[in-house]
UniProtKB/Swiss-Prot annotation:
Organism: Synechococcus sp. (strain ATCC 27144 / PCC 6301 / SAUG 1402/1)
Keyword Hydrolase: no
GO cellular component, one term: small ribosomal subunit
Keywords: Ribonucleoprotein, Ribosomal protein, RNA-binding, rRNA-binding
Entries under HAMAP family matching the protein: Ribosomal_uS14_1 (MF_00537)
Full protein name: Small ribosomal subunit protein uS14
Highest taxon above the source species: Bacteria
Complex formation: Part of the 30S ribosomal subunit. Contacts proteins S3 and S10.
Gene Ontology molecular function: rRNA binding; structural constituent of ribosome
Family per similarity comment: Belongs to the universal ribosomal protein uS14 family.
Record SUPFAM superfamilies: Glucocorticoid receptor-like (DNA-binding domain)
GO annotation, biological process: translation
Amino acid sequence: MAKKAMVERDRKRKKLVEKYAAKREALKEQFAAATSQSERLELHRKLQQLPRNSAPNRVRNRCWVTGRPRGYYRDFGLCRNVLREMAHQGLLPGVVKSSW
């Protein structure tokens, strides 16, 4: 089980990403369309002034049950340990133990 502070920090980051997503995307589009160097520098400065935690790459994928950041399966939102246990208990529809 991950520390509660780490899980909460990640939740806070997700909220910030959602809050600033539109603004960040608009600045990036303007930056790509900018022609002069001074305009690009100004847009880059504005982009840098956004909160650091509002960048999507600062968010870590975590298991929604345990908060574990490693061994994460995107399809389920679970870490490998919980995925295995839930699959054995039949709690994940369509997941069967492989056999060949």
